[in-house]
Every structure is written in C-alpha cells, then in structure tokens.
Curated annotation (Swiss-Prot):
GO BP: any one term: negative regulation of RNA catabolic process
InterPro entries cross-referenced by the UniProt entry: RraA, RraA/RraA-like, RraA/RraA-like_sf, RraA_gpbac
Protein name: Regulator of ribonuclease activity A
Annotated gene: rraA
Record keywords: Cytoplasm
Assembly, per entry: Homotrimer. Binds to both RNA-binding sites in the C-terminal region of Rne and to RhlB.
SUPFAM superfamilies cross-referenced by the UniProt entry: RraA-like
Main localization of the protein described in the UniProt heading: cytoplasm
Organism placement in taxonomy: Bacteria, Pseudomonadati, Pseudomonadota, Gammaproteobacteria, Enterobacterales
Species whose genome carries this gene: Citrobacter koseri (strain ATCC BAA-895 / CDC 4225-83 / SGSC4696)
GO CC annotation: cytosol
Length: 161
C-alpha cells in the first residue's frame, strides 16, 4: 500500500504527531506503514536479529540507536532477514550501511545517515520500551506511516482509502 504523509496530515491533523525531519529513505519502498515495535540499543544490533526473525507482517521495527552515526545498526543482511519475514519497514534513529543493497530490497528503511562501520552484535538493548526522538514519544503498538516527505505517528490505525 502507498502512503502519502502530507495527505494523512491534512486529514488527521489532530490525531497524528509529526517526527522532526531528520530521516532519509534508504529502502526499496518509498512509503510504508504499520504497527511499531520499539527497541532501544546503542551501536549494537544483536537484539534486532532476534526480533526480525519473527513474522513482521503489518509491523515496523522502530529503533532508538541514540542518534549515533558512528556504527550502522542495519546492513544488507539484517534488512534481507526483515524482508524475508515480511516486515513493512525499519525506522532507525541511527545509521545504516550497504545502501546500494538496501535500496534493492522491498522494505521501507528510514535512518539518519549511512556509514560503512558495522555495529557490535552482543544483543545489548531493550524492546517494547518507550522511546523518544525527533520530538515524538513512541510506544510499541502505535501506528507509523512514512514516505519521502516524512514520518508521522498515531496511537490508532488511520483509515487509508
């Protein structure tokens, strides 16, 4: 499904929070939406592997990486795993790498930047926790919609027709 965040903001102005314009699109899908699962980790993506092995149909993994762009939390291998398990998208408050490969995958990926250095894989972090970045507080179960214009968040799913 294609999402237009500008149109959704016009229709649901009172019901959505708009994330500050910090993110760029790195995935093969220009727009995506779904229910989020939150993760908080810093320069370590081990927990992301565990979560992305689950079925992700209708879901988005939202990762608070502390805004660090020193190490990439998502690479092509991790994004392929997410695609294979039908995740709608990844929102990374941090960095990604192997961007040429990422843009070939049928998944939405929004992140702050790209860097060639990979993350540690020790599994340090927490999931299903409240996270805050870009002027918005995110909870697992919220609904997120993203496109090349921006990212918006709603407590409830928006009626898209």
């Amino acid at each position: 499904m294609k999402y237009d965040t500008s149109e959704l903001c016009d229709i649901y102005q009172e019901d959505v929070n708009v994330v500050e314009p910090l993110f760029s699109n790195f995935g093969g899908r220009s727009s995506f939406g779904g229910q989020i699962i939150t993760v908080k980790c810093f320069e370590d993506n081990g927990l992301l592997y565990d979560l992305l092995e689950q079925n992700g149909r209708g879901r988005i993994l939202l990762v608070d990486g502390g805004g660090s762009v020193r190490r990439a939390l998502v690479d092509a291998e991790l994004a392929r795993l997410a695609t294979q398990n039908e995740w709608e998208g990844l929102v990374i408050y941090g960095a990604v790498r192997q961007v040429d490969d990422l843009e070939e995958l049928d998944i939405g990926i929004q992140a702050l930047a790209a860097i060639p250095v990979g993350a540690a894989g020790e599994g340090i972090g927490e999931s299903d926790v409240r996270v805050n970045f870009g002027g918005v507080t995110f909870f697992s179960g919220d609904h997120l919609y993203a496109d090349n214009t921006g990212i918006i968040l709603s407590e409830d799913p928006l009626d898209i027709e």
